């Protein structure tokens, strides 16, 4: 029972965050320096935003960099304010100076908002204490945060990675159940496919997250991570065999009518899903897995395959489920390979600075957007006669996310949570509760807020707002008079952040659709080249298959985010959803062909070359259609006909059937894009016609 409690992801996270915040307050209370303890507890907020609690092979190096940036920004703000430099200029300069971190890596990019938050915290401290005291608070606060988190992760044995792997296995179980229930149900594809695509998107997102964590921990170089690395590679093999599709609904219908295949397939899928959920719990709660076999289920599938040798569905299900069963039985991947190389870009400082100084740099646009928003917030504070508008500035930074949709949702949750929290705090302040009870209540509220923050950010904001008001009350003894002002400041900050995301150099996801579609087609092309090569190696096939899945997932994510953006053309949306659906079918065929190529199911060299030429022509045709700014025509000459005409007529092998279907999907995608491209949204000048 205690394992399920202490290792539960939400409970473990809430305990860690609550202890790292509240232990300094408790020590300050015991030593008679409660105010210093409360100020010390502000530093973990900066560290959380900077991601300094991320398990990393350079954990303490990142900690030192973060602490130096926090203390340095605090010193700069205090010195410049002492010289009467306007606050908008100070914050704008810091934002533009620190924006280069986004060019180094995505993890370094989180140092920008965290350092700005540290600067804004300094506004409330400047003039109330010596100039060196905030520097010590940030330095020792960051050190405390790092040492505590290092000890916590050592104590719980890399719990974040276990949580990600557990989520991956659980999502694979849900995906397996949903996929094979659709195989035996007569469901309209237009309604059945979107939920399945969402599940597959979650699986690939979790795989990408696990890759990032593995590389950050250098898991392939550490003996204590080999078991988790093996579990991750097992998950990759399971995803490969679960995600393949036959795409022969008429054959499925024939087999279901002639046998009890529907019940047997569902039995196998449910058995696999149940075992995956058990393994997910075993990883999360640090248990050794028990022995597992599903010989009866596989035997029933093989019997159906023998009874209906002319129907490919039985052989398809028996073969893939037998591979899944082997992975689950042996608790090992199907074949040995190293971890796929990390594709995360990391630049040294000076090359990153060179890229940052380009007007095309997304990092520069993001830093400029933040600097303008902070300047407007500072000027708004001056207009409202607020010498230190730190609440407006913090609200702007807290609600600003990477995209329009995420920022809009965060603004709604932040505003609603802050409003409710201020009302509750305003009512409870009238009761004049003793300090000991107040601190105990703040501890409980903080724990409950961290328990729900991952899934219910708005409700968590209610608790955090209450604790913030009571912190002001304990520090200044006049928290009640801040309530109305803080509500107005929150609304102003949310409006500034929303306006900045819409009007200040926005990066619309609809503008990235073309790039992501290009990347997906390019990944498909490389995978087909590798599969049809004379001697494809198993590790290379596995790496390229995952790149195909990740490229399609990026396209699917950008389409989902673009659907929430303003000014989106509904006709274009429907057409692009259909385009992405056909792209997903190609991914499933590549998944299936990868397993065939690894088992040395090959074509003759001449036939492989003809199919490769056909596929490359079709892929290039789709890419050229995306590059063209003209309306296009759906009646273009099919340039795939010539290579296809040389393919012998007769029974096709399984690999040839997959290739033929890929060609059909590419032809349909070209037709769709010819129609859809005229209706694409124009958010700024993001597509330019190249005149020759």
Model-predicted segments: where are they?
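Core alpha-helical transmembrane segments of integral membrane proteins
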Residues: 31-32, 346-447, 466
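C-terminal ends of transmembrane helices
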Residues: 45-57, 98-105, 399-407, 445-453
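Hydrophobic faces of alpha-helical transmembrane segments in multi-pass integral membrane proteins
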Residues: 15-23, 27, 64, 68, ...
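Structural signature of hydrophobic alpha-helical transmembrane segments
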Residues: 27-42, 76-93, 134-140, 380, ...
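Long, hydrophobic alpha-helical segments that serve as membrane-spanning/inserting helices
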Residues: 1-15, 22, 26, 30, ...
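Transmembrane helix-loop junctions at the membrane interface of multipass transporters and ion channels
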Residues: 110-134, 469-486
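Generic detector of multi-pass transmembrane helix bundles and their immediately adjacent loops
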Residues: 430-571, 577-580
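Short helix-perturbing small/polar motifs within transmembrane alpha-helices
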Residues: 73-82, 90-105, 120-126, 149, ...
């Amino acid at each position: 029972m205690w394992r399920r409690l202490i290792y539960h992801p939400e409970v473990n996270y809430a305990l860690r965050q609550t202890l790292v915040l509240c232990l300094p307050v408790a020590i300050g209370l015991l030593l008679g320096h409660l105010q210093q303890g409360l100020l010390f507890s502000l530093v973990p907020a900066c560290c959380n935003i900077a991601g300094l609690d991320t398990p990393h092979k350079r954990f303490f190096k990142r900690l030192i960099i973060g602490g130096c940036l926090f203390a340095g920004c605090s010193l700069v703000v205090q010195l410049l304010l002492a010289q009467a430099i306007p606050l908008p200029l100070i914050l704008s300069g810091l934002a533009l100076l620190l924006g280069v971190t986004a060019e180094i890596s995505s993890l370094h990019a989180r140092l920008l908002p965290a350092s700005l938050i540290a600067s804004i915290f300094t506004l409330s401290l400047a003039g109330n204490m010596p100039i060196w005291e905030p520097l010590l608070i940030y330095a020792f606060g960051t050190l405390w945060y790092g040492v505590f988190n290092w000890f916590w992760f050592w104590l719980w044995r890399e719990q974040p990675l276990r949580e990600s792997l557990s989520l991956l296995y659980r999502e694979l179980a849900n995906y397996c159940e949903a996929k094979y229930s659709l195989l035996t149900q007569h469901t309209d594809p237009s309604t059945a496919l979107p939920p399945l695509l969402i599940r597959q998107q979650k699986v690939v997102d979790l795989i990408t997250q696990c890759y990032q964590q593995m590389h950050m921990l250098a898991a392939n170089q550490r003996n204590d991570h080999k078991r988790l690395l093996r579990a991750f590679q097992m998950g990759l093999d399971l995803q490969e065999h679960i995600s393949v599709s036959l795409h022969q609904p008429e054959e499925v219908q024939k087999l279901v009518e002639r046998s009890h295949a529907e019940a047997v397939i569902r039995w196998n899928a449910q058995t696999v899903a149940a075992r995956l959920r058990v393994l997910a719990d075993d990883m999360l709660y640090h248990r050794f897995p028990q022995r597992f076999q599903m010989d009866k289920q596989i035997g029933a599938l093989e019997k159906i395959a023998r009874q209906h040798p002319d129907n490919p569905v039985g052989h398809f299900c028996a073969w893939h489920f037998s591979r899944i069963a082997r992975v689950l039985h042996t608790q090992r991947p199907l074949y040995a390979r190293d971890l796929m190389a990390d594709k995360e870009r990391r630049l040294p400082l000076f090359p990153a600075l060179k890229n940052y100084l380009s007007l095309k740099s997304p990092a520069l646009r993001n830093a400029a957007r933040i600097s303008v928003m902070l300047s407007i917030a500072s000027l708004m504070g001056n207009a409202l006669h607020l010498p230190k508008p730190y609440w407006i500035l913090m609200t702007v930074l807290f609600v600003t996310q990477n995209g329009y949709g995420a920022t809009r949702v965060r603004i709604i949750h932040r505003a609603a949570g802050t409003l409710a929290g201020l009302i509750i705090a305003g009512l409870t302040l009238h009761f004049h509760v003793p300090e000991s009870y107040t601190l105990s209540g703040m501890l409980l509220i903080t724990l409950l807020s961290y328990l729900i923050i991952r899934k219910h950010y708005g409700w968590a904001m209610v608790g955090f707002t209450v604790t913030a008001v009571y912190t002001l009350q304990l520090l200044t003894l006049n928290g009640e008079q801040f309530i109305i002002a803080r509500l107005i400041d929150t609304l102003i900050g949310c409006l500034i952040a929303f306006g900045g995301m819409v009007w200040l150099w926005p990066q619309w996801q609809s503008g990235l659709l073309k790039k992501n579609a290009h990347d997906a087609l390019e990944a498909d092309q490389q995978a087909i080249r590798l599969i049809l090569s004379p001697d494809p190696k198993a590790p290379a096939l596995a790496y390229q298959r995952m790149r195909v899945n990740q490229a399609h997932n990026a396209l699917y994510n950008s389409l989902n985010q673009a659907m929430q953006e303003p000014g989106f053309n509904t006709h274009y949306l429907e057409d692009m959803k259909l385009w992405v659906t056909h792209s997903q079918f190609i991914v499933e065929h590549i998944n299936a062909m990868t397993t065939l190529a690894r088992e040395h199911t090959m074509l003759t060299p001449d036939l492989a070359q003809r199919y490769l030429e056909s596929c490359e022509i079709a892929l290039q045709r789709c890419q050229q259609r995306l590059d063209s700014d003209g309306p296009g025509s759906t009646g273009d000459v099919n340039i795939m006909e010539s290579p296809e005409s040389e393919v012998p007529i007769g029974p096709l092998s399984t690999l040839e059937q997959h290739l033929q279907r890929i060609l059909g999907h590419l032809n349909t995608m070209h037709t769709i894009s010819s129609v859809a491209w005229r209706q694409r949204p124009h958010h700024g000048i993001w597509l330019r016609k190249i005149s020759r």
